[in-house]
Protein backbone atom coordinates (compact mmCIF):
# COMPACT_ATOMS: atom_id res chain seq x y z
CA UNK A 1 0.00 0.00 0.00
CA UNK A 2 2.99 2.29 -0.48
CA UNK A 3 1.29 3.45 -3.69
CA UNK A 4 -1.64 4.63 -1.56
CA UNK A 5 0.78 6.50 0.74
CA UNK A 6 2.40 8.15 -2.28
CA UNK A 7 -1.05 9.12 -3.59
CA UNK A 8 -2.00 10.54 -0.17
CA UNK A 9 1.31 12.43 0.03
CA UNK A 10 0.85 13.84 -3.49
CA UNK A 11 -2.70 14.91 -2.62
CA UNK A 12 -1.61 16.64 0.60
CA UNK A 13 1.22 18.41 -1.27
CA UNK A 14 -1.27 19.57 -3.91
CA UNK A 15 -3.61 20.79 -1.15
CA UNK A 16 -0.83 22.70 0.60
CA UNK A 17 0.44 24.18 -2.67
CA UNK A 18 -3.12 25.32 -3.38
CA UNK A 19 -3.40 26.82 0.10
CA UNK A 20 -0.13 28.71 -0.35
CA UNK A 21 -1.06 30.09 -3.76
CA UNK A 22 -4.53 31.00 -2.44
CA UNK A 23 -2.88 32.97 0.39
CA UNK A 24 -0.42 34.63 -1.97
CA UNK A 25 -3.20 35.57 -4.38
CA UNK A 26 -5.29 37.05 -1.55
CA UNK A 27 -2.31 38.96 -0.16
CA UNK A 28 -1.31 40.29 -3.59
CA UNK A 29 -4.78 41.72 -4.17
CA UNK A 30 -4.97 43.16 -0.64
CA UNK A 31 -1.48 44.65 -0.89
CA UNK A 32 -2.40 46.28 -4.21
CA UNK A 33 -5.57 47.69 -2.66
CA UNK A 34 -3.69 49.00 0.39
CA UNK A 35 -0.75 50.29 -1.65
CA UNK A 36 -3.13 52.32 -3.81
CA UNK A 37 -4.68 53.83 -0.67
CA UNK A 38 -1.26 54.61 0.85
CA UNK A 39 -1.71 52.21 3.79
CA UNK A 40 1.27 50.22 5.10
CA UNK A 41 1.62 46.84 3.48
CA UNK A 42 0.64 43.55 5.01
CA UNK A 43 3.51 41.06 4.88
CA UNK A 44 3.48 37.31 4.38
CA UNK A 45 6.53 35.17 5.08
CA UNK A 46 7.87 31.77 6.02
CA UNK A 47 8.43 30.92 9.67
CA UNK A 48 10.21 27.97 11.28
CA UNK A 49 6.96 26.07 11.63
CA UNK A 50 4.77 27.33 8.79
CA UNK A 51 4.00 30.86 7.69
CA UNK A 52 3.07 34.26 9.16
CA UNK A 53 0.86 37.13 8.06
CA UNK A 54 1.90 40.42 9.68
CA UNK A 55 -0.81 43.10 9.91
CA UNK A 56 0.11 46.68 10.90
CA UNK A 57 -1.95 47.75 13.93
CA UNK A 58 -2.82 51.08 12.33
CA UNK A 59 -4.62 49.18 9.54
CA UNK A 60 -6.82 47.46 12.11
CA UNK A 61 -7.12 49.79 15.10
CA UNK A 62 -7.06 53.42 16.18
CA UNK A 63 -4.17 54.34 18.52
CA UNK A 64 -4.44 52.65 21.93
CA UNK A 65 -7.65 50.87 20.86
CA UNK A 66 -8.58 47.22 20.34
CA UNK A 67 -11.78 47.94 18.39
CA UNK A 68 -11.50 46.97 14.71
CA UNK A 69 -11.89 50.29 12.99
CA UNK A 70 -12.40 50.13 9.26
CA UNK A 71 -14.02 48.30 6.39
CA UNK A 72 -10.68 47.44 4.71
CA UNK A 73 -9.58 45.60 7.85
CA UNK A 74 -12.89 43.76 8.17
CA UNK A 75 -12.79 42.80 4.48
CA UNK A 76 -9.23 41.53 4.80
CA UNK A 77 -10.12 39.43 7.87
CA UNK A 78 -13.12 38.03 5.98
CA UNK A 79 -10.75 36.95 3.17
CA UNK A 80 -8.33 35.44 5.70
CA UNK A 81 -11.27 33.51 7.22
CA UNK A 82 -12.15 32.08 3.79
CA UNK A 83 -8.55 30.95 3.31
CA UNK A 84 -8.35 29.41 6.81
CA UNK A 85 -11.47 27.40 5.98
CA UNK A 86 -9.56 25.78 3.08
CA UNK A 87 -6.48 24.83 5.13
CA UNK A 88 -5.80 21.17 5.95
CA UNK A 89 -7.52 20.15 9.22
CA UNK A 90 -4.22 19.93 11.15
CA UNK A 91 -3.23 23.56 10.41
CA UNK A 92 -4.16 26.09 13.10
CA UNK A 93 -3.76 29.85 13.39
CA UNK A 94 -2.27 31.63 16.42
CA UNK A 95 -3.15 35.33 16.46
CA UNK A 96 -0.52 37.33 18.39
CA UNK A 97 -0.85 40.96 19.43
CA UNK A 98 2.30 43.13 19.64
CA UNK A 99 2.84 46.73 20.76
CA UNK A 100 5.65 49.26 20.80
CA UNK A 101 7.46 50.12 24.05
CA UNK A 102 5.30 53.15 24.89
CA UNK A 103 2.55 52.53 27.43
CA UNK A 104 -1.04 53.08 26.24
CA UNK A 105 -2.25 56.64 26.83
CA UNK A 106 -5.88 55.56 27.16
CA UNK A 107 -7.37 54.56 30.50
CA UNK A 108 -9.02 51.53 28.89
CA UNK A 109 -5.77 49.50 29.00
CA UNK A 110 -3.43 49.72 31.95
CA UNK A 111 -0.44 48.33 30.01
CA UNK A 112 0.77 46.82 26.74
CA UNK A 113 -0.11 43.28 27.86
CA UNK A 114 -3.77 44.25 28.09
CA UNK A 115 -3.69 46.18 24.81
CA UNK A 116 -1.89 43.48 22.80
CA UNK A 117 -4.08 40.67 24.16
CA UNK A 118 -7.29 42.66 23.53
CA UNK A 119 -6.18 43.27 19.93
CA UNK A 120 -5.45 39.57 19.36
CA UNK A 121 -8.83 38.66 20.84
CA UNK A 122 -10.59 41.22 18.60
CA UNK A 123 -9.03 39.62 15.51
CA UNK A 124 -9.88 36.08 16.69
CA UNK A 125 -13.48 37.13 17.45
CA UNK A 126 -13.83 38.64 13.97
CA UNK A 127 -12.42 35.47 12.33
CA UNK A 128 -14.91 33.34 14.31
CA UNK A 129 -17.73 35.71 13.27
CA UNK A 130 -16.55 35.18 9.67
CA UNK A 131 -16.96 31.40 10.03
CA UNK A 132 -13.58 30.07 11.23
CA UNK A 133 -13.85 27.06 13.55
CA UNK A 134 -12.84 28.38 17.02
CA UNK A 135 -10.86 25.15 17.59
CA UNK A 136 -8.45 26.25 14.83
CA UNK A 137 -7.63 29.56 16.57
CA UNK A 138 -5.67 30.79 19.56
CA UNK A 139 -5.03 34.33 20.76
CA UNK A 140 -1.91 35.43 22.58
CA UNK A 141 0.04 38.57 23.39
CA UNK A 142 3.68 39.61 23.43
CA UNK A 143 3.20 43.28 24.46
CA UNK A 144 6.44 45.12 23.61
CA UNK A 145 8.71 42.11 24.20
CA UNK A 146 9.22 40.91 20.60
CA UNK A 147 9.98 44.09 18.67
CA UNK A 148 10.22 43.84 14.90
CA UNK A 149 12.14 47.13 14.63
CA UNK A 150 13.71 49.73 16.93
CA UNK A 151 11.51 51.49 19.48
CA UNK A 152 13.73 54.61 19.30
CA UNK A 153 12.00 56.06 16.21
CA UNK A 154 8.32 56.61 15.39
CA UNK A 155 8.80 54.59 12.18
CA UNK A 156 10.19 51.66 14.19
CA UNK A 157 7.46 51.88 16.82
CA UNK A 158 4.85 51.84 14.03
CA UNK A 159 6.33 48.56 12.70
CA UNK A 160 6.25 47.07 16.21
CA UNK A 161 2.53 47.80 16.63
CA UNK A 162 1.12 44.81 14.79
CA UNK A 163 -0.96 41.65 14.88
CA UNK A 164 0.60 38.48 13.49
CA UNK A 165 -1.27 35.38 12.37
CA UNK A 166 1.00 32.32 12.61
CA UNK A 167 -0.15 29.25 10.68
CA UNK A 168 1.31 25.97 11.96
CA UNK A 169 0.67 22.27 11.55
CA UNK A 170 -0.28 20.38 14.71
CA UNK A 171 1.11 17.21 13.16
CA UNK A 172 4.78 17.39 14.15
CA UNK A 173 5.81 14.94 11.41
CA UNK A 174 4.17 17.21 8.86
CA UNK A 175 5.93 20.41 9.96
CA UNK A 176 8.97 19.79 7.76
CA UNK A 177 6.75 18.57 4.92
CA UNK A 178 4.48 21.62 5.30
CA UNK A 179 7.43 23.98 5.15
CA UNK A 180 8.95 22.10 2.21
CA UNK A 181 5.68 22.24 0.28
CA UNK A 182 5.38 25.95 1.07
CA UNK A 183 8.90 26.50 -0.24
CA UNK A 184 8.18 24.34 -3.32
CA UNK A 185 5.09 26.42 -4.07
CA UNK A 186 7.23 29.56 -4.33
CA UNK A 187 9.41 28.23 -7.14
Task: Identify the role of each PLM range.
Residues 1-2, 185-187:
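Terminal low-complexity, intrinsically disordered regions
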Amino acid sequence: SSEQNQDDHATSNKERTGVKSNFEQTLRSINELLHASGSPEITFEESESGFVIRLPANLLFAKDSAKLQNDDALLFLKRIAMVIAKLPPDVVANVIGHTDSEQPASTEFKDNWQLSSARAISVVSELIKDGVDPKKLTASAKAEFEPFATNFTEQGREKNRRVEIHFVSLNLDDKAKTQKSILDAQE
